From Swiss-Prot:
InterPro entries for the chain: Rhabdo_glycop_CD (IPR055447), Rhabdo_glycop_FD (IPR001903)
Function of the molecule: Attaches the virus to host receptors, inducing clathrin-dependent endocytosis of the virion.
Intravirion compartment residues: 531-561
Membrane topology term: Single-pass type I membrane protein
A Pfam family assignment: Rhabdo_glycop_CD
Family: Belongs to the vesiculovirus glycoprotein family.
Organism: Drosophila melanogaster sigma virus (isolate Drosophila/USA/AP30/2005) (DMelSV)
Cleaved signal peptide residues: 1-30
Gene3D superfamilies membership: 2.30.29.130
Entry's Gene Ontology BP terms: clathrin-dependent endocytosis of virus by host cell; fusion of virus membrane with host endosome membrane; virion attachment to host cell
Segments on the Virion surface side according to the record's topology features: 31-495
Protein name stated in the entry: Glycoprotein
PTM info: Glycosylated by host.
Length: 561
C-alpha cells in the first residue's frame, strides 16, 4: 500500500512539473522582444526650463557609450575622415629640354667635316607648361638636327632647341602627401611641379591647378567624454572615448598622433585615423590638442574605409544627412522668424541614449531643458492614456504635460514634437527610421591598411650629355685625306721621273747610235709592264659611314631620351 501511494505521488509531481514548464514556455513565447523605435528623455519634475536662444541651437550629436557617473567632462569636436582610393598613382609628365646642333667645318682646301650633337639644357617651369599644353593639344612638332650650313674657310653651327614631353606616372605617399619616384632627388617631391635628378628634366602633374591628395573627406560632429582633465603633460590613458556622429565610439586608450594626407591626426587603437579639432562654436569646451597624444612609432600604418564597400553605410549616412538638413532648415526658420510646426521641432532631437537637450513650445515660445534620453519600444503606444511605450527595463513610459497648439485647435503639444490629438498620442514621423539608421551606423565598416611606399633611391643628381659624330659619304676626315692625297701624289711623281729618265736615256742612246732603234721596244716593254703591275696592285682602302657616340655620365643614369 505504501508503495502504491508513493507511486501516485511521484506521478502527480511529474504532471505538475510538466504543467509549470509548459506555462513558463508559453509566457516566454508570448513576450515580445524589446525593439526600440523611439528615444525619449527621463525628466525630473523639478527640471528647470529656460527660453531657447535660436542662435545657439545646434543639430544634435548622439551618444553611444556615455556613462553619466564616469564621464563628467565633455569636449565637442569636429572630425574629418578620409576615404583613400586604393590607387595611389598620380599621372604626370616629364619635360626634357635638349639642343640639337649641326656643325660644318670647311677649311681653305674645300673639304668639309659635318658633325651632329645632342646636349641637355636646363628647363624652366614656364617652358614646361607651354610644352605640355602643346602636347595635350597635339600641336607639338618634334624637331631633329638642322641642315648643315657650310661656307669656305669657316666653322658654322646651326642649332634647334626642343622640349620632349612624355607621360610618367609617380606614386603618392598618403602619409606625407608627397610624390615618390626614382626621378626625384632623394626619391621625394612636393605636390605640383618638381625638379628631378636630371638638370634637363622636370616632372609636372597632369592637373596643374589642383594637387592630388586624399579624396572623399567626410566631416562629422563628435564628442569626447572623459573622466578627468588632460593636457600636454598628462598621458592620454583611459581618459574616455570619442563619439563620432553616425559611427561607433572609439576609446582614446593607446591612441597616438601621426601625419596622413598631409594632416596631423589621431590613430586609434583599432588602426583607424581621423583628424580631430575643436568646434569653436563651443568656447566652454575643454581645450583639445592633437599634440596631447604621443607620436606613433616609426613605420606605423593606419586603416581607412574601403571606398567600394561602404555603400550600405552611405545609405545610412544619406538618411542621417537628410534629417540633419531638416534640422538645419528648422533652425534657419527660427532665426528668420518663420513659423515652425511640431514636426520641425522633432528634427532637433538626438536619436541615441545619453544626456541631451529637450525642447517644448508654450504659447509660441520655445523652451529648453536637459534630460537623460532612453530607448523606448512603442508597441504599447496608447495602450493606456498618455502612454508612449516601455523602456528596456520593462517600465511603462508616460507623458502627461500638454499645452494647446497656438495654430491648430484641438491639437496639444508635448516635448520634442510629440503631439496629442483626439485623445491619442502621435509620435513624429520618421523617428523610427532615424533611430534605425543611427543604430546600423554603430556597426563597423570594412577597412584596408595603407602601407608606406618603399623606394630605393638611385641618385640625388645625375649629369648627362650625348654627342654624336657623323662621317657621311660627302664628308671626310680632312687630316687623313690630306695625308693620303699628298703621299699618293709623291709616289706617282717618283715613278714618272724614273720612267722619264729611262725614256730620255734610251733616246740618247739611239741618237748616238749606241743601240739600234729596233731594240727600243724590247728594252721598254719590261719596265712598262712592271710599272703597270705595281700601279694596279695598289688598292684604295674602302670608305664607309662611321658613327661614334661619346657618353659623359659621371653618375648612374636612371632614364634616357
Amino acid at each position: 500500500m505504501a508503495h502504491y501511494e508513493l507511486h501516485v505521488l511521484f506521478v502527480h509531481s511529474w504532471m505538475l512539473a510538466l504543467i509549470l514548464i509548459t506555462t513558463l514556455v508559453w509566457l516566454a513565447a508570448s513576450q515580445k522582444a524589446f525593439t526600440p523605435d523611439l528615444v525619449f528623455p527621463e525628466m525630473n519634475r523639478n527640471s528647470s526650463w529656460s527660453v531657447a536662444n535660436y542662435g545657439e541651437i545646434l543639430c544634435p550629436t548622439s551618444f553611444q557609450s556615455y556613462d553619466p557617473k564616469k564621464h563628467q567632462i565633455l569636449t565637442r569636436v569636429l572630425v574629418e575622415r578620409p576615404s583613400l582610393n586604393t590607387d595611389t598613382k598620380v599621372e604626370g609628365y616629364t619635360c626634357h629640354k635638349v639642343k640639337y646642333e649641326t656643325i660644318c667645318d670647311m677649311p681653305w682646301y674645300f673639304s668639309p667635316t659635318i658633325s651632329h650633337s645632342i646636349s641637355p639644357l636646363r628647363v624652366k617651369e614656364s617652358e614646361c607648361k607651354d610644352a605640355i599644353a602643346e602636347h595635350q593639344l597635339g600641336t607639338h612638332v618634334p624637331l631633329s638636327f638642322p641642315p648643315e650650313d657650310c661656307s669656305w674657310n669657316s666653322v658654322n653651327t646651326k642649332e634647334y632647341e626642343d622640349i620632349i614631353v612624355k607621360e610618367h606616372p609617380v606614386m603618392l605617399d598618403p602619409y606625407t602627401n608627397n610624390y615618390v619616384d626614382a626621378i626625384f632627388p632623394g626619391g621625394i617631391s612636393s605636390p605640383g611641379m618638381g625638379g628631378t635628378i636630371h638638370d634637363d628634366m622636370m616632372w609636372v602633374s597632369k592637373d596643374l591647378a589642383v594637387s592630388p591628395e586624399c579624396s572623399g573627406w567626410q566631416r562629422s560632429m563628435g564628442l569626447i567624454y572623459s573622466s578627468r582633465l588632460y593636457g600636454e603633460r598628462e598621458p592620454m590613458l583611459e581618459v574616455g572615448s570619442i563619439h563620432i556622429e553616425g559611427h561607433r565610439d572609439k576609446n582614446l586608450t593607446l591612441a597616438c598622433r601621426i601625419s596622413f594626407c598631409g594632416e596631423i591626426g589621431v590613430r586609434f587603437h583599432d588602426g583607424e585615423w581621423m583628424k580631430v579639432s575643436v568646434n569653436l562654436d563651443h568656447p566652454n569646451s575643454v581645450t583639445f590638442q592633437v599634440t596631447d597624444f604621443p607620436p606613433c612609432p616609426p613605420g606605423t600604418t593606419i586603416q581607412t574605409a574601403v571606398v567600394e564597400n561602404i555603400n550600405p553605410e552611405i545609405q545610412e549616412l544619406t538618411v542621417n544627412m537628410m534629417y540633419r538638413l531638416k534640422c538645419q532648415e528648422t533652425i534657419s526658420k527660427m532665426v528668420s522668424g518663420l513659423p515652425t510646426s511640431a514636426l520641425d521641432l522633432s528634427y532637433l532631437i538626438q536619436v541615441q541614449e545619453g544626456p541631451g537637450i529637450v525642447y517644448k513650445r508654450e504659447k509660441g515660445i520655445l523652451y529648453q531643458s536637459v534630460g537623460m534620453y532612453q530607448y523606448i519600444d512603442t508597441v504599447t503606444l496608447n495602450k493606456e492614456e498618455n502612454q508612449l511605450g516601455e523602456n528596456s527595463r520593462g517600465q511603462k513610459v508616460f507623458w502627461t504635460e500638454w499645452s494647446d497648439s497656438p495654430t491648430r485647435p484641438g491639437l496639444q503639444e508635448g516635448i520634442n514634437g510629440i503631439v496629442k490629438y483626439e485623445g491619442q498620442v502621435r509620435v513624429p514621423l520618421g523617428m523610427s527610421l532615424r533611430l534605425e539608421a543611427a543604430t546600423e551606423l554603430m556597426w563597423g565598416h570594412p577597412v584596408h591598411t595603407v602601407s608606406h611606399p618603399i623606394l630605393h633611391v638611385i641618385s640625388n643628381h645625375t649629369e648627362q650629355s650625348v654627342t654624336t659624330w657623323n662621317r657621311g659619304v660627302n664628308s671626310t676626315n680632312l687630316i687623313g685625306l690630306a695625308t693620303r692625297s699628298i703621299s699618293g701624289f709623291y709616289d706617282n711623281l717618283k715613278l714618272y721621273l724614273i720612267l722619264a729618265l729611262i725614256f730620255v736615256s734610251l733616246i740618247a742612246l739611239v741618237v748616238l747610235d749606241v743601240i739600234p732603234f729596233k731594240y727600243i721596244l724590247f728594252v721598254l716593254c719590261p719596265p712598262l709592264l712592271l710599272c703597270r703591275f705595281i700601279k694596279c696592285s695598289r688598292r684604295k682602302p674602302e670608305t664607309r659611314d662611321r658613327y661614334h657616340v661619346e657618353y659623359n655620365r659621371p653618375g648612374q643614369v636612371s632614364s634616357a631620351f
